[in-house]
From Swiss-Prot:
Residues 167-178 have a biased composition (Pro residues). This is RanBP-type and C3HC4-type zinc finger-containing protein 1. It comes from the Eukaryota. The lineage of its organism: Eukaryota, Metazoa, Chordata, Craniata, Vertebrata. The active site is at C460. Keywords: Acetylation, Coiled coil, Disease variant, Host-virus interaction, Metal-binding, Phosphoprotein, Repeat, Transferase, Ubl conjugation, Ubl conjugation pathway, Zinc, Zinc-finger. A zinc finger (IBR-type) spans 351-411. Residues 69-131 are annotated as: Interaction with RNF31. It comes from Homo sapiens. The keyword Ubl conjugation applies. The modification Phosphotyrosine is found at Y330. Residues 1-220 are annotated as: Interaction with IRF3. Residues 55-119 form the Ubiquitin-like domain.
């Protein structure tokens, strides 16, 4: 088949498609060309051979790394393979030059229709293989030019070449430079190599300032550096300005959120009590508490009702009130803060709590002295070089050596008078003798801290001194804990340390 006959067949097919598609301009151009060439034609009407309704095509996609994925495409049987490639390019970003279609076990060509390959109903399958683009220099300009040429080919113009906009007027020939025959225009200036970084995944050439691939969104190589002399174009400047504005708004919103959180914490810290914001259950009385009805302890975040916390404070024998939470695993060692206690109690109960703390501090100190005036609350911490204490409450002078008030007598006169009165006081003498017998028989003992006489009524071997509140092990006649207080096993009886009781006769000293 000669070149003229082949060209005539192509123009006839283009005329057929233009008439079927209603394109008057293309049909007129094809008809004029056929008439000028005096090509013999036979025109006849025929029914529609390719259905035009939309169907769903099942496509298996595989790349050069043997990664496979299945997708569904909505197509028409009269679509060409070139149109199918353009659709995949627009929807998924894979350039047509990288697409290789296999339909009906045949390699599909661009100008062939899907109907010619047997794609006629829903569920028909096709195979798409994505070629590696490592050896292909892709850029947006070439992709756009290829797409325009493909659209012209669909219209029947296969031998056209896209030229830049505006007329190109050849200049006068230079003297002394002969022109080669057959060449009416000078050679086109080759385009400079594209500036940018090549995506390691799809090999697309991206602009230097872009942080990720425009095609596959892969991150820019860390080793790439933007050329110092590079000037971004208008599109890049707009994108960079948008990124800067987004970053500024993000930083502004973050700062506003931080300031709001700070103000919220300041307002929360100014409150004496932290109330619950969600429904909770008191672990002591098991009452279900609505938001705002319970108190959340600041130190340990355990939640209780007000009544249980008030009862815990009133019944506490310590200056520091512990959290009442306890279960089968552990008991909480957190403490209630002073402002929490003050907010929970009435003024009278809070004053009693303060008095209890002062009393405990006085009794637990080895250098404290309480005024001997009956019902007087005055006391002090004394030093070795001080022998007298003037009570700030009752204003009586206490002798720290005799531990008594003898304002009209000196120490010698007072002790002689005391011995004389003891000989004549039968009740005082009987009490002294009874205490001595109890100490000798082991029915009583002296507190290892304040030396007062204490005794155990019944039950376990743990007792507490009523004066200095020292915890005592009855069976060892010594303190239960070390100098650090409850839980300090560096001293005391060290009961149950390594599972060993403090004494063979120990009856649980806690």
């Amino acid at each position: 088949m000669d070149e003229k006959t082949k060209k005539a067949e192509e123009m006839a097919l283009s005329l057929t498609r233009a008439v079927a598609g209603g394109d008057e301009q293309v049909a007129m151009k094809c008809a004029i060309w056929l008439a000028e060439q005096r090509v013999p034609l036979s025109v006849q009407l025929k029914p529609e051979v390719s259905p035009t309704q939309d169907i769903r095509l099942w496509v298996s996609v595989e790349d050069a790394q043997m990664h496979t994925v299945t997708i569904w495409l909505t197509v028409r049987p009269d679509m060409t393979v070139a149109s199918l490639k353009d659709m995949v390019f627009l929807d998924y970003g894979f350039p047509p030059v990288l697409q290789q279609w296999v339909i009906g076990q045949r390699l599909a060509r661009d100008q062939e229709t899907l109907h010619s390959h047997g794609v006629r109903q829903n569920g028909d399958s096709a195979y798409l293989y994505l070629l590696s683009a490592r050896n292909t220099s892709l850029n947006p300009q070439e992709l756009q030019r290829e797409r325009q040429l493909r659209m012209l080919e669909d219209l029947g113009f296969k031998d056209l070449t896209l030229q830049p906009r505006g007329p190109l007027e050849p200049g006068p020939p230079k003297p002394g430079v002969p022109q080669e025959p057959g060449r009416g225009q000078p050679d086109a200036v080759p385009e400079p190599p594209p500036v940018g970084w090549q995506c390691p995944g799809c090999t697309f050439i991206n602009k230097p300032t872009r942080p990720g691939c425009e095609m596959c969104c892969r991150a820019r190589p860390e080793a790439y550096q933007v050329p110092a002399s590079y000037q971004p174009d208008e599109e890049e400047r707009a994108r960079l300005a948008g990124e800067e504005e987004a970053l500024r708004q993000y930083q502004q919103r973050k700062q506003q959120q931080q300031e709001g959180n700070y103000l919220q914490h300041v307002q929360l810290d100014q409150r004496s009590l932290v109330l619950n914001t969600e429904p909770a259950e008191c672990p002591v009385c098991y009452s279900v508490l609505a938001p705002g009805e319970a108190v959340v302890l600041r130190e340990c975040l355990h939640t209780f009702c007000r009544e249980c916390l008030q009862g815990t404070i009133r019944n506490s024998q310590e200056a520091e009130v512990s959290c009442p939470f306890i279960d089968n695993t552990y008991s909480c060692s957190g403490k209630l803060l002073e402002r929490e206690i003050k907010a929970l109690l009435t003024p009278e109960d809070y004053q009693r709590f303060l008095d209890l703390g002062i009393s405990i501090a006085e009794n637990r100190s080895a250098f404290s002295y309480h005024c001997k005036t009956p019902d007087c609350k005055g006391w002090c911490f004394f030093e070795d070089d001080v022998n007298e204490f003037t009570c700030p409450v009752c204003f009586h002078v206490n002798c720290l050596l005799c531990k008594a008030i003898h304002e009209q007598m000196n120490c010698k006169e007072y002790q002689e008078d005391l011995a004389l009165r003891a000989q004549n006081d039968v009740a005082a003498r009987q009490t002294t003798e009874m205490l001595k017998v109890m100490l000798q028989q082991g029915e009583a003992m002296r507190c290892p801290q304040c030396q007062i006489v204490v005794q155990k009524k019944d039950g376990c071997d743990w007792i507490r001194c009523t004066v200095c509140h020292t915890e005592i092990c009855w069976v060892t006649k010594g303190p239960r804990w070390g100098p650090g207080g409850p839980g300090d096993t560096s001293g005391g009886c060290r009961c149950r340390v390594n599972g060993i009781p403090c004494h063979p006769s120990c009856q649980n000293c806690h």
